[in-house]
Amino acid sequence: RRDLAEMLKEMKPGFLRFPGGCVIEGWDIENRYQWKHTVGPAQERTQNWNRWAVSKRPKYLDYNQTYGLGFYEYFLLCEYLECDPLPVLNVGLSCQYQGKETVPVYAEDSEKDIGVEINGVIYTTEFYQYIQDALDLIEFCNGDESTLWGGLRSSMGHIEPFNLTLLGVGNEQWEA
């Protein structure tokens, strides 16, 4: 809505965080917010069960996220508002208020994973995907059109990089 965007612009925010709060964590790891599901043609984006449905009881099953407003649209909004984007990515934990589901970080903590070595540290391949998602988001924002993710951004209509400088990791994680 143009009126809301104009009201936000009048506030002159220095940055805009997205997505907010527990939505990034999901009810569980499977339905966490994943930025890659929010880019590309809007009609081809998957839907996700919304964390704010409170529970998986039948009366809330139709409370979904459509991803019609995805990371690409969010970065465009930040450009319009003339503020820095602060995208937030999941850190491998579900909402700790609801549960304790975590992705094992180190290969030695996982019985099924041989891992990926980075600077002498062996991470589980499952956790490495979170690292790769962050690197891919940076490429989507800052890469030129010859890169995979920079090329997607360019094909969506934004040839110039977004010049991302901030990145949020996780939300209200305790004991992490």
Residue ranges and their predicted role:
Residues R1-A176:
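Non-catalytic accessory regions flanking glycosidase/transglycosidase catalytic cores in CAZymes
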